[in-house]
Amino acid sequence: MAKQIRYDHFLHGGDYNPEQWLDRPDILKKDIEYFKKAHINTVSMGMFSWAVLEPEEGRYNFDWLEDVINNLYKEGIYTILSTPSGARPKWMADKYEEVLRVDPDRTRRFFGGRHNHCYTSPVYREKIYNINK
């Protein structure tokens, strides 16, 4: 049974995608300032970060994620970690064409866009399993 956590306040926030600004620590710092001004105490992260979390097949980088989460926590901001399956990395589409979605007219979609994947692809399912471990 899942542990129930009770808070004495509402969790308030939204999606946060800091991976697009990793080369700009000044922006990441400013984000936290803005969050505090808006009384944001919770962010969800990771939903579109797969390409940064696994830049090459089998090579994972979670250091940046840990740093961002720690910096948020120091400022009283909680993190809800999402699965990064919203946008898979380009290397996957290049190497495994079968992970790309096929439309009803049997046209295979090109890489790009969110949720453009074939949910029944065994390769896609394996890669999702691996990144979520």
Q: For each predicted feature, which ranges?
A:
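Generic structural motif recognizing short loop/turn segments at the entrances and edges of beta-strands
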Residues: 1, 10-12, 96-98, 106, ...
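The substrate-binding groove and active-site-proximal loops of carbohydrate-active enzymes
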Residues: 12-23, 48-64, 110-130
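An acidic-aromatic substrate-binding cleft motif
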Residues: 1-25, 34-41
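Aromatic-lined substrate-binding rim segments of carbohydrate-active enzymes
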Residues: 28-109, 129
